[in-house]
Structure formats: structure tokens, C-alpha cells
A protein has these predicted regions:
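N-terminal glycine-/serine-/threonine-rich beta1-alpha1-beta2 phosphate-ribose binding loop
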Residues: 2-168, 184-196
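A contiguous active-site-proximal alpha/beta segment in oxidoreductase catalytic domains
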Residues: 169, 177-251
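Hydrophobic residues in well-ordered beta-strands that form the structural core
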Residues: 44, 172, 197-199, 392
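C-terminal helix-rich "cap/oligomerization" subdomain common to oxidoreductases
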Residues: 12-35, 332, 435-502
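Non-transmembrane alpha-helical segments in soluble domains
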Residues: 11, 55, 70, 116, ...
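Short, solvent-exposed loop/turn elements at domain surfaces
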Residues: 50-54, 76-79, 140, 235-237, ...
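Short, solvent-exposed turn/loop segments enriched in Gly/Ser/Thr/Pro and often Arg
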Residues: 73-76, 131, 150-156, 176-178, ...
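Glycine-rich, aromatic-lined ligand/substrate-binding cores of catalytic
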Residues: 47, 250-435, 441, 455-461, ...
Length: 502
């Protein structure tokens, strides 16, 4: 048995825990701390702005030792982000180093050198390795127990499968994959390997407990519709492909960044935060935000296998020689859209429509809000029954029956608590996943429980890409009314990038 297999077995057995009494003193921690030999060694893959923002959560977890970082970019100070210095302030606060990268204000850092520096600064040593290619990382550091994947969406699936096939536990940002068939394979690989997995959106999901109680006691009659709307996208959704070819930045491996996707010239409009808007690289606003709001809804109502997915989307017009014409666009998500999913009845639940809105779209104001002289917020969720409605925040927080008079006799749930951001927050999901890595039960955010939401966000993308109402055969994973759409359910992998190759 290999050394890394021995170590993982040791972490997952009570016999291994008992063996601490004979370890050399240099491997023992101070009183009350977890010994280094019992920590989960983890590689953090993806050190762009989102990856760096998430890294402090791992560093603050006592069960975890970050030993390596990986990213195709060595270093850059010109990343794109949600604000100019917000990331820098967050990192300084997390590291308790107000002077970290002093003089770099007004720039946005990123890359594996920055990630390594964060890890080494936090631990007070120089023990973190850094790689451009995750495959080299896996080859050279076989004793790594787990990985966290914070790359652009198109790389999630292949990296997750490569890690799980090597017996490594995995935590990943949303989505699991940005192709339906690839997401299915990721979930099946998690099932067949038995490693501990955690899908990060679980940590931000709201509770369906109160909403379910009102549905079950008949407060809104039979549930018919669920409406969920977001103010995303808050990044550019480019309506045309880049035509210029700027040079690849020094220290950036464009080929590695492309990963499984087909070759094309480098352009900065594909990378950083704007990857979300491209069908090849991202998953659109529903993949970005719908996992946070809807996963708990899918789980509670057992939603999967929609029979129909119907898109309504904005379009682009251009003038060419004085004549207006539409832009044919099957490469980027629209600026605004509404997508309706029709889910069949299941068990005691009747058929339900789920309607997703983005880009400023939302349902019309219902009479119940007119009665209260109120209007919808920019983001929210509404459950519509044949006898009433429940309005909640975007992530199902603070649900209430509308109009207000209907709350009489229905105590409102406590307001959702907001965690302070002064220190890194250790989500219950991270702790539960760490316990699963050591042989405990899978976390409630396990990949095995994400099939329904992964199916929906990938079908949403296919419907928008084809601009067609699609009829879907869930059992056979097939679009039945528009054969051309089926090619978008899976990915055509570049040579050397198929799940079998990595």
C-alpha cells in the first residue's frame, strides 16, 4: 500500500487516533491543538479573486493544513473584481496584517504566488508549494488528502473527477460542472469512490422549514409556482466575440486555463470574473446565484426531471450599412432573461412550475402587495399556491404570508442572522466535511444530494443558448423536440483533457 493510502486510512480510523500516544514529540501539538499529523492536508486549486477570498476560511480551520496552491497564473496585479480594494482589505483582516502588500492599493492581486504568500504568512513558515498544473500537483504531492476547487466553472468537473479518482476528498464552488453530463459523471464518481465531498452553496442556503410548514398546513392551498429573481448579472455579458488578440500576460498559462475547452486566442474578456457570462466557461447567473437560493428548495420539494424548460431572453440588434439586424449569439448569456421549468407531480406534491428571473426581470406585483402598499425588492423568492402566497428573501430568509393580515395567527420566524465579516467564518458545512474526511458521515452538502439543482442550472444554459422551449426526457438525458440542443448537454473535450485522461 502506498504511503498516501496509509495516511488516509490512518486519518479515517479510531486505531489511528489511538496511535498518537507513540508519535514522536515533534509531531505533537501544544495542549488543546490538533497534532499536525492528524490534520487534513489540502491543496487549494484556483487563486483568482474568489479563490483568494475563500482561502482564509481554510486557513482558520483547525482541522486543515493548506500545503499547496495551484493556478495557471503565477502573479498578476490587474485582476477584475467587485471593487478595487475590497479583496485587499479582506485578506489583510484575515491575516491580521494591516500592512500586507503595502503600497499595492488600487490594484487587484491574484495568482498562485499571492496564494502561497497568504498561506506562508498565516502559518509563519515557507512550507506551501505552488503549481501551475493540477496534474503535476497530484503527481508530485500524492500524500495530499483533499482539494478545494475555486477555478472558473469549466474546470470544476475535470479537476474534481481527477482528484476523486486518486482518492482525494473534494470541496468545490458552484457549479459542480457547467455541462449536464459532466455534472452527472462528477456525482457518479463521488458515489463510486466514496470520498468525502462538499458543495459550497449549501453553506449559504436558507431554511425551508417554515415555508414547508405553511405549505403542509394548507395556508396557501396547493403549491403551483415558485418564483426566484436576482439582480445578476453584475458583470459584462458580451454580445460579440473578441476580435483583437492581445498578448498572453507573462506568467499566465493560457493553455492550462482553457483546460477541456477548445482552443482560441487569449483575451482578458474571457477570464477573471467575466468568465461567468460565456457558455463555454461559465454557467450564467443561475449557476452563480441559483445554487444559493434554490438548492434547499429542490431538496425540500424533491424537484428533478423537468419536462419542459422555456426561455425568454433579451436580444441584441446592430446596424450594418444602415440596416438593422439581429445578432446571432450562441456563445454568451443574454443580458436579461426569464426561464420557466415545469416539474411533474411527485409523491404527495402536485406539478410545480419554477420560474427564474435575472437581469432586472421579476414577476408582476401581485394584488397582495398592492393591498399592503408594498413592492418587490431587487431579489426575492415567492411561493404561489391556489389559495395564497408566501414571500421570502432571495435565499428563503424571513418568509411571510402576504398580504400582511394573513400573518395573524401565523407567528413570523426569527429574522435571519447575519454573520459579522471581521473574522473568517467557519461554516458548519466545512466542519462537517472535515469530519467526513476523517471517516464521519457525508456533509449535508455532499455532491450526492446536488443532482436536481445541477440538472436545472445546466438545462437553463441549454435553453438560453438555443432560444427554444425544450422538452426533456430526464430518464434518458435527452432533449426530445430539438435534437441540435443535445450537443450542449455534454462537452467535447480537447485532447488530453477528458475525464479518462486527467
Amino acid at each position: 500500500m502506498s504511503n498516501d493510502s496509509n495516511r488516509r486510512k490512518f486519518l479515517g480510523t479510531t486505531a489511528g487516533a489511538a496511535a498518537f500516544t507513540i508519535l514522536p514529540r515533534r509531531l505533537l501539538a501544544r495542549s488543546g491543538e490538533i497534532p499536525p499529523s492528524d490534520k487534513i492536508t489540502l491543496a487549494h486549486i484556483g487563486t483568482g479573486t474568489e479563490g483568494l477570498r475563500e482561502l482564509p476560511n481554510l486557513l482558520a480551520a483547525p482541522e486543515i493544513q493548506v500545503v499547496s496552491v495551484c493556478d495557471p497564473c503565477k502573479f498578476a496585479a490587474g485582476y477584475r473584481d467587485w471593487s478595487r480594494d475590497g479583496l485587499l482589505r479582506d485578506i489583510r483582516r484575515a491575516l491580521n496584517k494591516p500592512d500586507w502588500r503595502a503600497g499595492s492599493e488600487g490594484t487587484i492581486p491574484g495568482g498562485r504566488d499571492v496564494g502561497k504568500n497568504m498561506v506562508d504568512t498565516f502559518y509563519g513558515n515557507q512550507g506551501c508549494s505552488a503549481y501551475a498544473d493540477f496534474r503535476e500537483l497530484f503527481d508530485k504531492q500524492k500524500d495530499v488528502d483533499a482539494v478545494k476547487i475555486m477555478t472558473p466553472d469549466h474546470l470544476h468537473g475535470v479537476i474534481a473527477m481527477a482528484a476523486m479518482k486518486r482518492g482525494k476528498h473534494v470541496i468545490v464552488h458552484k457549479p459542480i460542472a457547467n455541462r449536464l453530463m459532466e455534472a452527472d459523471r462528477v456525482i457518479e464518481t463521488a458515489r463510486s469512490t466514496g470520498v468525502a465531498t462538499h458543495f459550497m452553496p449549501w453553506d449559504s442556503n436558507g431554511s425551508m422549514e417554515q415555508v414547508l410548514a405553511w405549505i403542509r398546513d394548507g395556508s396557501i392551498g396547493t403549491l403551483r409556482e415558485i418564483h426566484n429573481w436576482t439582480n445578476r448579472p453584475v458583470w459584462p455579458q458580451y454580445a460579440t466575440l473578441p476580435t483583437d488578440t492581445p498578448p498572453v500576460p507573462e506568467g499566465f498559462d493560457w493553455d492550462l486555463w482553457l483546460g477541456p475547452e477548445h482552443e482560441r486566442p487569449y483575451h482578458p474578456n474571457y477570464t477573471n470574473m467575466v468568465f461567468r457570462g460565456w457558455y463555454d466557461f461559465g454557467g450564467g447567473s443561475m449557476a452563480d446565484m441559483g445554487h444559493y437560493s434554490l438548492w434547499t428548495v429542490f431538496r425540500a420539494l424533491d424537484l428533478s426531471g423537468p419536462t419542459s424548460i422555456e426561455p425568454m431572453a433579451s436580444h441584441e440588434q446592430v446596424l450594418t450599412d444602415g440596416a438593422a439586424s439581429g445578432v446571432k449569439n450562441d456563445f454568451s448569456f443574454p443580458a436579461a432573461s426569464v426561464v420557466r421549468f415545469q416539474y411533474p407531480a411527485r409523491g404527495t406534491r402536485g406539478a410545480v412550475d419554477l420560474i427564474w428571473y435575472e437581469g432586472g426581470m421579476r414577476p408582476p406585483t401581485p394584488p397582495e402587495l398592492d393591498e399592503d402598499r408594498q413592492e418587490f425588492g431587487a431579489e426575492a423568492m415567492m411561493f404561489v399556491g391556489d389559495k395564497g402566497k408566501i414571500l421570502a428573501g432571495f435565499r428563503v430568509e424571513n418568509p411571510r404570508l402576504i398580504p400582511e393580515r394573513r400573518m395573524s395567527g401565523h407567528p413570523a420566524p426569527p429574522a435571519a442572522a447575519r454573520a459579522p465579516r471581521e473574522t473568517p467564518q467557519l461554516s458548519p458545512g466545512l466542519r462537517q466535511w472535515a469530519a467526513a474526511c476523517k471517516g464521519g458521515a457525508q456533509s449535508p452538502g455532499s455532491f450526492l444530494l446536488a443532482g436536481g439543482i445541477s440538472e436545472a442550472v445546466n438545462l437553463y444554459a441549454v435553453a438560453l443558448r438555443t432560444r427554444r422551449r425544450l422538452f426533456y426526457d430526464a430518464a434518458n438525458r435527452k432533449i426530445t423536440n430539438f435534437a441540435e440542443a443535445n450537443k450542449y448537454l455534454s462537452r467535447e473535450y480537447r485532447k488530453g483533457w477528458s475525464p479518462e485522461s486527467v
